A protein has these predicted regions:
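A short beta-loop-alpha structural element at the N-terminal edge
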Residues: 3-19
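Helix-loop element at the rim of GNAT/NAT acetyltransferase active sites that forms part
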Residues: 9, 21-34
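Short hydrophobic/aromatic beta-strand element in the GNAT-like acyltransferase core
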Residues: 33-35, 46-50, 61, 91, ...
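Conserved beta-strand in the GNAT
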Residues: 50, 57-67, 72-79, 88-93
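Conserved acetyl-CoA-binding loop-helix of GNAT-fold acetyltransferases
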Residues: 94, 100-113
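Conserved GNAT acetyl-CoA-binding A-motif
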Residues: 108, 115-128
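Conserved catalytic-core motifs of GNAT/GCN5-like acyltransferases
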Residues: 125-127, 137, 142-157
């Protein structure tokens, strides 16, 4: 992990295609889902962050979509104001052979540092598959609201206020 190149990548570039392939393999294909052109086009205005190993293979990636703090953050901390600029963190993927080795935590740390360094936004929220809620709690996210179904799987809404 010490030799990992963490970087923001541009939509549509070859590195972006590598992250789409990883996200498809881990998040979409197991559910029988595929990316549509429209879904990928909708990512043009998002921030794409990824880690690459020395060979250039993508190790981990995620997407930050500019948004506003959603109304479902009912038990939010006082600093979480509705309609405040926020990022919707989505499509977090870590290569299967690297899962459980700290890559997800390193990716989240990189994403949080990116937000703090490059943006005035401090609120980040996500929809976590129930199977990984514990991971997000360990990285500082709090559950908000009741479980719900998304892409046929139970999810939990979660949020975190980043402090510099």
């Amino acid at each position: 992990m010490d030799e990992t190149l963490w970087q923001e990548i541009a939509w549509g570039r070859s590195e972006y295609a590598l992250t789409v392939a990883l996200r498809h393999t881990l998040l979409r294909a197991p559910l029988g889902l595929h990316f549509t052109k429209e879904a990928l086009d909708a990512e043009k205005d998002s921030i794409h962050l990824a880690g690459f190993d020395p060979s250039g293979a993508v190790s981990a990636c995620l997407v930050l979509r500019p948004s506003v703090t959603p109304s479902w953050i009912q038990a939010a901390p006082p600093e979480a104001v509705l309609d405040m600029p926020a990022y919707h963190l989505r499509q977090v993927a870590v290569r299967q052979d690297l899962q459980g080795l700290g890559w997800g935590r390193a990716l989240m740390d990189y994403a949080h540092a990116w937000v703090l360094d490059k943006s005035p936004v401090r609120q980040v929220y996500l929809h976590a598959r129930s199977s990984v809620v514990g991971f997000y709690e360990a990285t500082g996210y709090k559950i908000a609201g009741e479980p719900f179904l998304e892409v046929g799987l139970e999810h939990r809404a979660m949020h975190r206020f980043l402090e510099s």
